[in-house]
Amino acid sequence: MKWTCPLGPRFLQRENPENLLQKSEIKFLNQVQGPESVAFDPLGRGPYAGVADGRVLFWNGRSWTDFAYTSPHRSDICSPKPSPLSYLKNEHICGRPLGLRFEKKTGDLCIANAYFGLLKVGPEGGLATPLTTEAEGVPLRFTNDLDIDEEGNVYFTDSSTTYQRR
């Protein structure tokens, strides 16, 4: 398959002043492990990021702080580790937040968790509570991402009806 940039070859050149990616920088390197999704709350604060150990973190302008937990079974096995791969064997216990979206009207954060389905936590954070673990009687096996429309309807993806992430 061949692809041609519709903006022309000049757009892809390294020295193109219109290429905004040249001005980008990597933020928070080695500060958070395995961020999958980021979101900003209705007041524009954040980012909030779901990470590999099951937490949702909040950037307060100076550092990352805990905002929410996705597992009621959180213990020392869920403590931060140096590599995202270190979390795989305990994800089913610690949780794995893959999608984050704020409800604009309430400020609640909805979380798509690979193991615990759809969760929600209030604007103050804390332990997220389940919204649902099934759809039309079929258990959610790999809840991956979500979005919320203006009326508050939640749309989500469940990437497998058979397999979980691990």
Predicted features along the sequence, with ranges:
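Blade/loop signatures of beta-propeller domains
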Residues: M1-E25
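Beta-propeller domains
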Residues: P6-R10, P17, L43-P80, G117, ...
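Short active-site oxyanion
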Residues: K23-I26, G44-P47, G107-D108
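WD40 beta-propeller repeat fold
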Residues: I26-E36, F40-P42
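Conserved beta-strand positions that form and line the central face of beta-propeller blades
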Residues: I26-F28, D66, T129-L131
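Short coil/turn segments at the loop-to-beta-strand junctions that recur within blades
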Residues: V32-P35, S71-S75, E134-P139
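Soluble, non-transmembrane catalytic domains of enzymes that act on hydrophobic metabolites at membranes
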Residues: A39-F40, G44, W59, R101-F102, ...
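Asp-box/WD-like beta-propeller blade repeats and closely related beta-sheet repeat scaffolds
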Residues: C78, P84-L98, E103-K104, D108, ...
